[in-house]
Amino acid sequence: MEKLTLSPISRIDGEINLPGSKSLSNRALLLAALAKGTTQVTNLLDSDDIRYMLNALKALGVNYQLSDDKTVCVVEGIGGAFQWQNGLSLFLGNAGTAMRPLAAALCLKGDTESEVILTGEPRMKERPIKHLVDALRQTGANIQYLENDGYPPLAIRNQGIFGGKVQIDGSISSQFLTALLMAAPLGEGDMEIEILGELVSKPYIDITPAMMKDFGINVDDYNYQRFLIKGKQYYISPQTYLVEGDASSASYFLAAAAIKGKVKVTGIGRNSIQGDRLFADVLAQMGAKVTWGEDFIQVEKSELKGIDMDMNHIPDAAMTIAITALFAQGETVIRNIYNWRVKETDRLTAIATELRKLGAEVEEGEDFIRIQPLALDKFKHAEIATYNDHRIAMCFSLIALSDTSVTILDPACTAKTFPTYFSEFEKISKNQ
């Protein structure tokens, strides 16, 4: 297995221009494909998950031109539901941001009835999709499980979604609601979505209506409890759509600066629609100096204090706090993060396991993690298993800010969202 050893870093200094957000990139591509008109999507992320979406769109008859550097994509919208040859199979890797929205969009009524199969890697077949399928079935969608109930692969017939009242469980993933919201305007009738339970990752939900509005559709949101969307509408191309820098990916550079230096991250700012921008506020609460601009966030180190906080609203970026906690004074508790368990891997167990290898004292609860700090000279060298999870690989790069080197196994797994992560991290790592 490939491995990468990072030597101890004495300070962090520099500027990072963020690649496009994964979730925004895939949503923008899908909306552009469904819209009337041609859309130029810029600052598109070049990564595995985006390639799975692009390959699926091509198989569904969508024409697009991708620039040589793969960051600009001109998409010719089809102006309604997808059409495809019966028996099509789409392989979506482990890309939840492709699987969930496509599962909903492919239910929309086509001119000719056809079946499509959505499948992916073994881990994708372990990632729950029942809450979305249950909701789609309430609207009249025809979806079958091909292996295990509640999980991909799925067989979908484009017989339509017919609106009405729909209840969806919001406790596992905000992507289920996102998928339903994006498909609803092209359905056969008006839809009223009622959220059961506490909606997780609320700021991630805010992204979806904001993007839908850019493509000409309004969503009425009643305090995250109910959403109303009119049916029989069309998305209209905004002609160009700029994908914001990935706020989750910003977290590693910002945390590195909070621990040992100063960094300016561009491509995201105070007006970002991404919830993970709030990560910088958590660093500020821990003691870091944070400066916000229209198109940048700057963080400078200061003495960090541990924190006890519900981080359900920023689950991806919260992982970075678990590492930052080692460098703070006093214990850190990250709460209400059960949804870590249903991501690319069971992130709660994975992070607790790898932190212990470093010599950290960690308590793993069902939906929380408690971490004690470590003195810089007390870190043990460890080989960090990454579980084919891009965010674990990126998080644990921060261990090199101690007095000990760290070895990351399978570093190439960052290709899911940030193929050039380690070279970017090296640019801001100084050793004098």
Curated annotation (Swiss-Prot):
3-phosphoshikimate binds at residues 22-23, 27, 173-175, 201, 316, 339, 343. Pathway: Metabolic intermediate biosynthesis; chorismate biosynthesis; chorismate from D-erythrose 4-phosphate and phosphoenolpyruvate: step 6/7. Phosphoenolpyruvate binds at residues 22, 96, 127, 175, 347, 391, 416. GO terms for molecular function: 3-phosphoshikimate 1-carboxyvinyltransferase activity. Keywords: Amino-acid biosynthesis, Aromatic amino acid biosynthesis, Cytoplasm, Transferase. GO terms for biological process: amino acid biosynthetic process; aromatic amino acid family biosynthetic process; chorismate biosynthetic process. Gene3D superfamilies: Enolpyruvate transferase domain. GO terms for cellular component: cytoplasm. Coiled coil: none annotated. The active site is at 316 (proton acceptor). Its EC number is 2.5.1.19. It is found in: Cytoplasm. It catalyses: 3-phosphoshikimate + phosphoenolpyruvate = 5-O-(1-carboxyvinyl)-3-phosphoshikimate + phosphate. It is an enzyme of class 2 (transferase). Monomer. Catalyzes the transfer of the enolpyruvyl moiety of phosphoenolpyruvate (PEP) to the 5-hydroxyl of shikimate-3-phosphate (S3P) to produce enolpyruvyl shikimate-3-phosphate and inorganic phosphate. Belongs to the EPSP synthase family. PANTHER family: AROM/DEHYDROQUINATE SYNTHASE, PENTAFUNCTIONAL AROM POLYPEPTIDE. This is 3-phosphoshikimate 1-carboxyvinyltransferase. It comes from Histophilus somni. The gene is aroA.
